[in-house]
Amino acid sequence: MKQTYITLNNGTKIPQFGMGVFMVPAGDETKNACLEALKLGYRHIDTAHAYQNERSVGEAVRESGIPREEIWVTSKLWPSEYGEGKTMEGIDKMLVRLDIGYIDLLLLHQQVGDYMGAWKDMEKAVAQGKVRAIGLSNFESDRLEEVIAAAEIKPAVLQVELHPYFQQNALKERVAPYGTVLEAWYPLGHGDSGLLNEPVFTQLAKK
C-alpha cells in the first residue's frame, strides 16, 4: 500500500489513509490488527481514551519494527478530562498508556464540557513537545466557531462523519481559511453495503 500525505496548517504531514480501532477489543485483537495494518503499509492509527485500547495500539507501534517517526498516532480526550489543568493530567496519562513518546494528533472527542479550558491545555502540550498537532472531533456550528475564535493554535484537523452520502461541503468551506483539514470517520458509510454497491464505485473497482 502506497501512502499519500496531507500537510497540516502547522507544517506536519499526516498519512491520508488510517485505520481506526473503534470497537476493537483491547489486548491481542487490537495489537494484531494494528500490526497487520502496519505490515500492509498503513502508517496512521486512530484510537481514543473512550475506546479503551490505547495500550494495545502503543504495543503494536513499539513491536512493529517501524521507526516511531514514520507512524502517525491519533487519540482523543473524553469530556470527563476537559478543563484547564485537568486536561494536562489526561494528556500525561494518555502518554503513559500509549508509551510511544509523544502523540501525533490529539483531538477533543465531543463538543460538551469545558472544551475551552481543554484547548488551552492542548496548546500547552504542543509547546511542551507532548503533542505534535491538535484538533477537534464532532464539533460544529457555534462551538466550533468559539474554539477557532479563541485559539492561539488553530485546529489542524476537524474529524467528522464524512462520506459520499454526507459530504460536509459547507463545513469544509468554513474551516478552509484556517488551513483546518476535514478528516472522515465512516468514510465508507455506516458499514452496510449500500455505498459500496453504488454503480459509480463498482465501475471504478472493476478498472
Identify the residue ranges that each predicted region occupies.
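N-terminal binding-site loop/beta-alpha segment at the start of enzyme catalytic domains
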Residues: 1-71, 188
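Conserved, mostly hydrophobic/aromatic
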Residues: 19, 37, 45, 57, ...
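Acidic-and-aromatic substrate-binding clefts and catalytic sites of carbohydrate-active enzymes
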Residues: 24-28, 46-56, 80-85, 111-115, ...
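Short, acidic/polar
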Residues: 25-38, 82-99, 117, 142-146, ...
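A structural motif
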Residues: 42, 100-103, 131, 155
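A short, structured active-site edge motif that brings together acidic residues
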Residues: 68-81, 102-111, 138
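CE4/NodB-like, metal-dependent polysaccharide N-deacetylase domain
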Residues: 87-107, 124-128, 180
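Beta/alpha (TIM)-barrel catalytic core signal, keyed to glycine-rich beta->alpha loops juxtaposed to Asp/Glu
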Residues: 110-207
